Amino acid sequence: IPALKNAEFVRYGVMHKNIFINSPALLDCDFSMKSKPEIFFAGQISGVEGYVESIAGGLMCGVNAFRRLKGKAPIKPDGATLCGALALYVSSPNECFQPMNANFGILKPLGEEIRDKAKKKEAYALRALAHTDKILTEVSDG
């Protein structure tokens, strides 16, 4: 590439740097600061990894910031949904905290053992949808 003929590579093999806070020490499960609950963190800096995960955290921050302004209790996450599981992950004590993306391994276990992977994922999805409906009802009522 002609335009790069004088380029110098300072460090090989690094595509991006992930900067994040020590969320388990600093954040509550609604992404607000434990010491200053009026301050919220969302996105990569909160310890979630990925675009969708960052958007989900931002949505949770927005909803809970609005609820706080209205004098209402924040929506506390549950490990039944990936959004909730990520929120619990970033706010739970962890000696070696590293950012996490959405994955089935962080979800609250199902009440039953399902060996078929497709059926297990479907069960997780159905449970998450039911829990999301419950949260949406709570948000719209409050």
Positions of PLM-derived features:
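Alpha-helical scaffold segments in soluble metabolic enzymes
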Residues: N64, A85, H131-K134
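A generic structural signal for short coil/turn motifs at secondary-structure boundaries
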Residues: V48-Y51, K119
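Generic hydrophobic secondary-structure packing signal
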Residues: G50, S54-G57, C61, Y124, ...
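C-terminal auxiliary extensions adjacent to catalytic cores
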Residues: M100-G142
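A glycine-rich dinucleotide-binding beta-alpha-beta segment and adjacent secondary-structure elements
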Residues: I1-V48, I55-A56, I75-Y89, F97-N103, ...
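Internal hydrophobic alpha-helix adjacent to the cofactor/substrate pocket in enzyme cavities
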Residues: S54-P77
